[in-house]
């Protein structure tokens, strides 16, 4: 009978933990030194049976089975060692379950003990000059993936001899010098994964050795974060670029690094950081990749930690003028897009609630400040304007008959458009030439992304549309001069959406007073607050509301029936406020 096809193909693998449990069970149950082993009992029975002349053949067979089981342990330990090493490597990238290592070939050695002995012996021979540099590098290359060989060999060599090997690694093949470095990198990475520790008394990994290897193999995440922490110091700049590249390729390590250094990073990566002991210009691009991995996460990374990193940096840049590099501002744009649903909730929910772990729950003013920092980069500006246009369209189209959706769409486009306009005004106040360059890049990028020009992206609506396009030479300037009527030095902070939220809640209260079944609040109570009412008799949120009641209230405020009922009252008040702010009546 054939094996049913479970979709797994011909893959055979090992779960290292389960194999370890099996090894311990076999050792304890069939050996003479195991706790609760049956072997001593069987031997005792055989002795007694022999004394009284009973047949002991069956007991002898049991003992043979016990001996056979004990004889399998070295082989099983070898398989478990190979599997555990690969599992640890893959675990840093979020992969779990069975692995292929150890399921088939045992490598060049039948047991872990044999591999370890060979690793130590070969290293000693090299140290004693009994084998040449090239021959030893060939041995390392042949056994670079063997954790038992690597652990014993690296331990015997020590940090300083390994550093010498790094400098001489091209001797493996002078025509292909990178082969030796790659083999040594795998050798050291597997040794460290198997437990070799090179840290000094202060807990620092050796930068001079490992910075030259980390981009040639997969090193443990904690090793990368240790090296990266050291690279924040000005004296270690020479090692940092290779470390930044390796860190960016490991989302788990990058997320932890950003988390551990979140308070210092804005200073480290500020715009003039090269002159203040921080990030140097040639390495900005590679560090930007670290920052993106640390805020967005990826395989193996903790999404809660990544969101927490983002929350802290969004909050920081919403209240500081400590501008960063354009590359970081582009990362911020990517982050805004990645957390787009969180941005939308913050900007448009009539009653924002905590979005929970793995999300960025910040006030709309925080996102506005973060968007403002990102838009210092004109390419990022164009991408964010295109993103906001697409998001607004999707929100509006999702519920075309619901005024709440249309209001949300306007809030999204208005927020991003306002921040872009504010950035333009600030740049123009300092240097009109820079502003023209910024605008030109935005226009070019938008033309590529949207297939149209910046005049449409910044079109404030009917007022601008009354002006002939032929007369529009500087749409942004036209917008700020004829529509907003606020000079750069008077502009201040962006208008908070809290005011419209007050209007929305007040209009909902007025409508609810007329109809207590408006929007069927009970259905939202059933979904979000275990049936507990969330409204007072006059349509306000109950005091000391639970998170579930707050969520129910937020969703009820967006109900189509509620939005349609309050639409007129809300619009009259909201548009009146907007007119007084902008001068458009």
Annotate each language-model stretch with its function.
Residues 1-106, 110, 114:
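N-terminal secretion-targeting helices of virulence/extracellular proteins
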Residues 1-4, 581-585:
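Short, solvent-exposed mixed-charge patches
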Residues 89-584:
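Non-catalytic all-alpha helical scaffold/repeat segments
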